Amino acid sequence: TFPGRFAEQILPDQVHILNVSFLVPTLRREFGGCAGNIAYSLAHLGGEALVMATLGNDGQSYVERIRSWGASTEYVRVIEDSYTAQAMIITDIDNNQITAFHPGAMQQAHVTAVPRRRDIELAIIAPDGRDAMIQHAQQLADARIPFVFDPGQGLPMFSGEELLEMVRLADYLAVNDYEGKLLEEKT
């Protein structure tokens, strides 16, 4: 957390040459990511998750954490020449945030195909690599596995036509108010 206000550190007439640093005296490292967050929540609700995700060569502790919830990691792929996706988020005292995001291994998520298993009752396509989200939507539809399309922060990656197709293929759509407005404008 930055103990001040970003607005007091950024000179509006100088943003074209922005070069600013924020001292953040506290740091927390947490596990996150859509697949992990969904699996964690599902486990705490008594459900069983089958996680399909990509991690980097630094992801073994996350695999162990997912397994500790009772979730399957059968479809978690480790990309040895990448780091796991990660975000550095700085929050000021007004809860404004600046985020730097490195997709890392997530950029290879499309190399894992949706498993054709009869025991999958519902899938969720949440923010992931762009190509993976498109391919997995089609693969789920082809396998007749019902799914939720939750584009979240990945929504800006897609054209209006791509979004319409994924919405058409999906059984459910999950967006917040802002994402809903953006989806409406893009389509």
Q: What are these model-predicted stretches?
A:
Residues 1-50, 61:
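Glycine-rich phosphate/adenosyl-contacting loop at the front of the ribokinase-like
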Residues 1-5, 50, 64-78, 86, ...:
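Ribokinase/PfkB-type carbohydrate-kinase core domain
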Residues 19, 37, 57, 95-96, ...:
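Detector for Asparagine
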Residues 34, 58, 132:
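Conserved alpha-helical elements of sugar-nucleotide-dependent glycosyltransferases
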Residues 53-55:
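Short beta-strand/turn micro-motifs composed of small residues
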Residues 57, 63-64:
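Short, compositionally biased leader-like segments
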